[in-house]
Amino acid sequence: AAVVEILADRKRPVWMTGGRFTQACAEMLQAHLYQLRPNCQVIAYTPAGRADALLDVARRDVLLVFDVRRYQKDTIALTRTAKAQGATVVLITDPWLSPIADLADHVLTVDVEAPSPYDSMVPSVALVEALVAGVVAKLGKTTRSRISNLERLREGYTWDDQALSISGEDD
């Protein structure tokens, strides 16, 4: 509930990032959250992208980090710097707890065991969907208005029969 409150607070920019595999979860969360509220950014999964994002991370900001075993030094370093700059840190991690747990204000754990050599992302995706549902419930009707506005803006940028025509005119 506390994490949903934080994510629903429109006055607090939210930055999201992950590791080698979990970056996809951060991108999925951002793809939903920005439709519900402003100021939601994914931090690029590159050394320069991470450093560049830190330029703008400030005291009221939230850094939501996905970090599961095979914990990455660059993700830990990014979080350490964001925390030093005053960001609230939300960590989504496995039961073994990323070292980021020591820095985090909020820690959510997900099971990652799978019948393969790779950790399962399914529980992380389910948690993303639960967080999004919580934010929708918290923000109420304002989310519908924002989504409607976004859909209206997208009308000129989506595929339709005319866009598929070579001449751009009706055939």
Q: Locations of the language-model features?
A:
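A short, charged, Gly/Pro-tolerant segment at domain boundaries
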Residues: 141-171
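HTH-adjacent hinge/linker in prokaryotic transcriptional regulators
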Residues: 1-2
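Glycine-rich phosphate-binding loops that contact phosphosugars or nucleotide phosphates
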Residues: 8-127, 133-137
